[in-house]
Amino acid sequence: IASVVFKAGVKDYRLTYYTPEYETKDTDILAAFRVTPQPGVPAEEAGAAVAAESSTGTWTTVWTDGLTNLDRYKGRCYHIEAXVGEENQYIAYVAYPLDLFEEGSVTNMFTSIVGNVFGFKALRALRLEDLRIPTAYSKTFQGPPHGIQVERDKLNKYGRPLLGCTIKPKLGLSAKNYGRAVYECLRGGLDFTKDDENVNSQPFMRWRDRFVFCAEAIYKAQAETGEIKGHYLNATAGTCEEMMKRAAFARELGVPIVMHDYLTGGFTANTTLAHYCRDNGLLLHIHRAMHAVIDRQKNHGMHFRVLAKALRMSGGDHIHAGTVVGKLEGEREMTLGFVDLLRDDYIEKDRSRGIFFTQDWVSMPGVLPVASGGIHVWHMPALTEIFGDDSVLQFGGGTLGHPWGNAPGAVANRVALEACVQARNEGRDLAREGNEIIREACNWSPGLAAACEVWKEI
């Protein structure tokens, strides 16, 4: 009898895990994988192998399979389609039952879905293109500490994108000189300045000194401008305890916002910090250092839209999202696709924008996308048009590279932004008339004119 019930040995995954007749449930987590099978491996077997290895499967039949209800717990490859324009690439859709995942843990979700399967022999390459997070699962996450509307209310800034600047040179400044640069930028008209992602607590500038001098700069700039200012104090550290210590010190200083590198720091640390930020009224700026290691290859790894969705669940109020212009160019439609996934409550499936599933966030707060990297005043009309009001535009070199100094660089950016917003509100077409709008603004802002002269060729 045993030989009938339990047949030892290796069997094809597709017999168990490829189920084209399966109707997906509202509670399933759905994944779209770009699969490149090894030569000779059928697409169905490759898709089923992904479903198996990222859920209940192992490479051989085991006795203990009989002690569980495989039908309840297994991942299922329910649809496969050939990837358009690519040879030997397929999009495999996999449904995972919700019971496979721990509530409120992005870490566990990724360990399950992408933890093991990417080294699989039968696959030449594998890329996770998108995830559909069911309402039942997203409701177990707190999400962003505050969200877009609460942030605007805290800062008292409406009807325009926010302006930021990463302090450069990113490594080597003393805390006092660093604070001075922060003050000059904020005084000139920026809303935020930013620690670079790799500024943590190095020998030339320990974190506590930086926090103190930056707080002084913030309060001085606020007093002089009458506007609320912030500096993203990077709390990223070698241990979670040290990270929380830094966040607590920022709160004691009374500053509005801290920062975290969520991929190098890890999702567990990020979610911990996000909970602290909500409980203590701190905004949380997220940098995506290390993302290109994961998302740059077109056929292997994970698309950034998956990392962006994961961040919205784990928690963050801002996240870097590419620029569409500048030095880190992203494809426009794809970028806007995941920008909407970050900001909006309900996003329709739209394959032309890389969105494989309709996503309903059921009122989870939104995240402000941050455009940063090689941008300057001439890009302002395009950025305003592409990203709209709910965004942060960050000019590092585009502020600090101004020939007259940091404060005039900040003035130039603020004038350019205000000119673009006003022109848009008057009904002008930023895409077509952008350069003209900037040139007109130069007439009443010498600082902007000087900036335009420096970067006119770029």
UniProtKB/Swiss-Prot annotation:
GO terms for biological process: photorespiration; reductive pentose-phosphate cycle. It is an enzyme of class 4 (lyase). RuBisCO catalyzes two reactions: the carboxylation of D-ribulose 1,5-bisphosphate, the primary event in carbon dioxide fixation, as well as the oxidative fragmentation of the pentose substrate in the photorespiration process. Both reactions occur simultaneously and in competition at the same active site. The modification N6,N6,N6-trimethyllysine is found at K7. Heterohexadecamer of 8 large chains and 8 small chains; disulfide-linked. The disulfide link is formed within the large subunit homodimers. This is Ribulose bisphosphate carboxylase large chain. It comes from the Eukaryota. PANTHER family: RIBULOSE BISPHOSPHATE CARBOXYLASE, RIBULOSE BISPHOSPHATE CARBOXYLASE LARGE CHAIN. The record marks K327 as: Transition state stabilizer. GO terms for cellular component: chloroplast. One of its GO terms (molecular function) is monooxygenase activity. It is found in: Plastid, Chloroplast. Coiled coil: none annotated. Belongs to the RuBisCO large chain family. Type I subfamily. Mg(2+) binds at K194, D196, E197. The keyword Magnesium applies. It catalyses: 2 (2R)-3-phosphoglycerate + 2 H(+) = D-ribulose 1,5-bisphosphate + CO2 + H2O; D-ribulose 1,5-bisphosphate + O2 = 2-phosphoglycolate + (2R)-3-phosphoglycerate + 2 H(+). Its main location: plastid. The basic functional RuBisCO is composed of a large chain homodimer in a 'head-to-tail' conformation. In form I RuBisCO this homodimer is arranged in a barrel-like tetramer with the small subunits forming a tetrameric 'cap' on each end of the 'barrel'.
